[in-house]
Design a protein with these regions (language model features):
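Flexible, solvent-exposed loop segments that connect beta-strands
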Residues: 76-82, 104-123, 145-155, 173, ...
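Short, conserved beta-strand segments within well-ordered enzyme catalytic domains
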Residues: 23, 45, 71-73, 90-92, ...
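Mid-chain, structured segments of secreted extracytoplasmic proteins
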Residues: 54-88
């Protein structure tokens, strides 16, 4: 009887595990002045080991499991002859048998306007070293930089924190990020989990370099263990943004 119960639990746990996630997104920018902009994107993450969902919020399962991974994304828009492309790859590595964390990413932003000389290319990069002093808590220091083709370049120190914990009978996710120097960028975010499958949240983002200042609200719902949908609305000084994404885990 005991062995049969353990076998059933093992099968149940394996059924809720996943090792990859792929997603598709659509974003719409509605500026106060000028034409609207639409972008489509795809993204993917592969985990080195299967991620067990256990009793955690499904959106935080990989983080709480300290699941090392590689990830990639690409976004593309062609609006009235203005082509915008962003793509990048990254890695997160939780050092085995320790509480240390490493991450890095590199990306490329390209913008091209038909019948003009506008053809900008910017390479971006970032790296972090982090520590997890308690379950669900990550503290990280790093560097974030950019290099424009035939233009400026720079790199600035960064600090980041993420904390997933319980408040009463519900889970919450709290995040903060800052980059100091030429970038002068910071971001805060909070998510409240109504249950393990549904969250609502808010965020604020400010970047002096790009003159971006935006407050956003978001929601995410897992329709089952594999399929999720999410949306966000952002309210900026000069524009509003709308985004949706659907993803599948396997």
């Amino acid at each position: 009887m005991a062995s049969a119960l353990l076998s059933a639990l093992a099968v149940s746990g394996a059924a809720n595990a996943y090792q990859a996630e792929v997603g598709g997104s659509y974003n719409y920018l509605d500026p106060d002045n000028g034409s609207s902009v639409s972008k489509f994107g795809v993204d993917g993450t592969y985990y080195f080991n299967p991620v067990q969902t256990r009793n955690a919020p499904l959106a935080e399962a990989a983080f709480l499991s300290r699941a090392s991974n590689v990830n990639a994304l690409i976004n593309y828009g062609d609006n009235s002859g203005t082509k915008d492309t962003q793509y990048g790859v990254g890695v997160e590595y939780y050092v085995p048998n320790s509480d240390f964390y490493l991450s890095g990413d590199v990306g490329r932003n390209e913008r091209e306007v038909d019948n003009t000389n506008i053809d900008s290319k910017v390479t971006t990069y970032a790296a972090e070293v982090g520590y997890l002093p308690a379950p669900g808590l990550l503290l990280a220091l790093g560097v974030k930089g950019y290099d424009e083709k035939d233009g400026k370049d720079g790199a600035d120190p960064t600090v980041r924190a993420k904390y997933v914990t319980q408040v009463g009978q519900h889970d919450v996710n709290l995040e903060a990020f800052g980059a100091f120097g030429d970038l002068d960028e910071y971001k805060v975010r909070g998510d409240y989990y109504i249950d393990k499958t549904l969250s609502v949240g808010a965020d604020y983002y400010n970047n002096d370099l790009t003159d971006k200042d935006e407050f956003g609200i978001n929601a995410k719902k897992f329709l089952n263990q594999q399929v999720s949908v999410e949306g966000r609305v952002g309210f900026g000084d000069n524009d509003n943004t709308y985004g949706v994404r659907a993803a599948y885990r396997f």
